[in-house]
Swiss-Prot record:
This is Anhydro-N-acetylmuramic acid kinase. Its EC number is 2.7.1.170. One of its GO terms (molecular function) is phosphotransferase activity, alcohol group as acceptor. Catalyzes the specific phosphorylation of 1,6-anhydro-N-acetylmuramic acid (anhMurNAc) with the simultaneous cleavage of the 1,6-anhydro ring, generating MurNAc-6-P. Is required for the utilization of anhMurNAc either imported from the medium or derived from its own cell wall murein, and thus plays a role in cell wall recycling.
Amino acid sequence: MKSGRFIGVMSGTSLDGVDVVLATIDEHRVAQLASLSWPIPVSLKQAVLDICQGQQLTLSQFGQLDTQLGRLFADAVNALLKEQNLQARDIVAIGCHGQTVWHEPTGVAPHTLQIGDNNQIVARTGITVVGDFRRRDIALGGQGAPLVPAFHHALLAHPTEQRMVLNIGGIANLSLLIPGQPVGGYDTGPGNMLMDAWIWRQAGKPYDKDAEWARAGKVILPLLQNMLSDPYFSQPAPKSTGREYFNYGWLERHLRHFPGVDPRDVQATLAELTAVTISEQVLLSGGCERLMVCGGGSRNPLLMARLAALLPGTEVTTTDAVGISGDDMEALAFAWLAWRTLAGLPGNLPSVTGASQETVLGAIFPANP
C-alpha cells in the first residue's frame, strides 16, 4: 500500500483560487504539512463561468481552456514544491479534482465534466496524477457527488456524538456522520455561489468580505420565498447540483418579479437563502449535536450566526476547531482519494451517491520512471 507525501489540488465551483495541499497519508492518518492558494487569472475565471452558464464555444476554445487549466494546476503544484524545497521524487502522487464545468447526473445519459488536462500536470511537474474521480460513480448509477463525505467520515466521525460536516463552497454540501447509521451526504443547494455572483456584477468585488454588504441590507421575504420554491430544495437525497443550475441566470429569473430592489437587500436575501436551505436539510436529516463547517462560507460571520440561530440545539463550529483547516478540506480530501486509488481501495460511498456499489475512483496518469 503506497504511503508518503501526496498533493491535493482543488478548484471548486466558487472559483476563488486553486487550493493546493501537501500531506503525508497512510492507512492510519492524514497529516497536513503545507498549503497555498494560487490565483486564477480573471480571463480564465470568466471563460469557466461562461461555459458553466451554457455559453457556446468551439471545440478549439474548449481544448484551449482544458490545456490552460492543466497548466495553471501544474504551476500551483510547482509553486508549493518550491516553497517547501521539495522535488518531484519526494511526492507519491497528485490528486487533482479538475474544474467542473458541467454536472448532469440524471437523465438519458448522466454525465459530469471536469477539465484541466492531467497530462499537462504530469508533463510539467514530473509527478503521477490521479484525476477524473467522479465518472466511475456515475457509470455505476450514482450522482458522482458528493465524494468528500467518505473523507469526512474517515477523519471526523465520532463513536457516540451525532455530527455533521458542512462544506460551504460555491455549492453547500452536507456529510451526515451519525453513529449506527450509514454515512449520508448531499448538496443542499447554493453556498457562496449566488452571493459571489451578485456582488461581482453589482460592485465588482469577488466576494462579500465579512458579509459587509449583506449585513447592510434587509432580507426581502417574498423574494426569499420565491427562491425557496425551487424544486431542487424539496428533492430527496441522493442529489447533487452545480453552477450549471444555480447561476446568475437562475437569480435573474427570480429577480424579474422584484424590480428596483436595493442590491444590498438582495445580498442579504441570498445569504439567508443559503442559511435556510442548509438548516432545513440539517433538521430534515434528523439534526445533530455538532455541525462542523468548512469552506469559504465558514469565514462568513453572517452565515455562521444565522446557522447558529436557525439550529439552536446544535453546536455550530468550524473544522479548524478540531485541527483541520476549513480552507483546505476539499484539496486534502482529493489527496486522500488519490491515495485510496493507488492503494486499490474504493473512494465512493453508495449510501451517499446512490451508486450500485463501492468502487475504486479515478484515472491514473503515471509519470515517467
